[in-house]
A protein has these predicted regions:
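Intrinsic disorder/low-structure terminal segments
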Residues: 12, 78-79, 128, 138
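Active-site acidic catalytic loop and adjacent metal/ATP-binding pocket
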Residues: 1-16, 20, 63, 166-196
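ATP-binding pocket architecture of kinase catalytic cores
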Residues: 13-37, 43-121
Length: 197
């Protein structure tokens, strides 16, 4: 989780909103690597959007740079970053076909805009985060140990996962065999109900 605060500033003409975030350096042990990735990806997308003649303002996040022109600051050994504000909303579930449509549109647009982006330039900030076979093995170990005695409360869910164990490596196998390309992933929807950023 990233700790977030909303802030705003006024000039003589309008109020400008920002989102100030403390990067959780327990989860993201290399905040510098995270910000390196964010900057590479957002700049690549911004340049593609401009090249395609579209409005770039809400097409990607806009980092607010420090006085030293950095994309983050360190205060009391904590890493902070700032973006211009984009109104947002997260959907945990939905039955609205428009929300499904916009989610698919966002994923497709994101992948389109990152066409040609070289993922080997990125840093791997959470080791094995998308390594589903590794995640499944960890899951099995935790269920087996059950040191908090909770497995009995979720037998149905555990069986659901176990029945799908043979599918856990479909993507990692395809990546290893170069049948599919390695891609950048990130999912984010905004309050306007349309894929925007």
């Amino acid at each position: 989780e990233i700790n977030t605060d909303n802030i705003s500033a006024k000039d003589e003409f309008k109020e400008i909103k920002y989102i100030l975030q403390k990067i959780n350096d327990y989860v993201f042990q290399s905040p510098i690597g995270v910000m390196y990735n964010v900057e590479l990806i957002t700049e690549y997308i911004r340049n593609r959007v401009i090249y395609e003649g579209e409005n770039y303002r809400n097409a990607t996040l806009t980092l607010v740079r420090s006085k030293l022109n950095q994309n983050f600051v360190i205060v009391n050994d904590e890493y902070w970053r700032c973006y211009t504000w984009i109104d947002g909303k997260t959907y945990e579930t939905t039955s609205d076909p428009e929300v499904f449509y916009e989610a698919g549109k966002a994923v497709g647009k994101f992948q389109h805009l990152l066409e040609g982006f070289h993922t080997r330039c990125l840093t791997d900030n959470i080791k094995n985060f998308h390594n589903t076979p590794y995640r499944y093995e960890t899951f099995r170990d935790v269920v087996k140990i059950d040191d908090l005695d909770r497995a009995s409360e979720c037998k149905k869910e555990i069986e659901f996962i176990k029945k799908r164990a043979n599918k856990m490596s479909v993507i990692t196998d395809a990546l290893a065999e170069k049948r599919i390309p390695r891609r950048v992933v990130h999912n984010d929807t905004k309050q306007i109900g349309r894929a925007s950023c």
